[in-house]
Amino acid sequence: QNYETNVQQAVMDAFMANNTFASVPEALVQKYSDAAESSITSMASAYGVDADTFTQYNYGQDLATFLSTYAEQTAKQDIALQAVANKENLNISDEELDRMLQDRATAAGYDTIEEYIGETSKEDYREYFLYDKVLDYLVENAKITNN
């Protein structure tokens, strides 16, 4: 990992450690659990193993334990990042989303956004771009010290 990635991870860890949650919407947790399970199942299949074996090997946990922990942490992170986006006016407008997607589509050699995103929804891309935008904001405003 490079320095920037380490800084981003440290900032995100500190940010999340300073957030508390009374509860997390079950639908949001389920959304992340389903997405992770689909991704893991696909990767496991590519390696010729089942999803449980894959998560045990890569994460040291059975699939159900990994999904439960991962989905809850990701849902909490999503809520916290959205709160920062709302407070700091960092939300991504439809126009900004289209511009970002068009830039990526063009760079990747696609004629249209639709060809570029395929089966993925624009909202999934909005979430992805928002994560990066808020993380950049947090890093820019963090007080970073070298230990």
Report residues per predicted region.
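Extended, charged alpha-helical "arm"/coiled-coil substrate-binding scaffolds
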Residues: 1-147
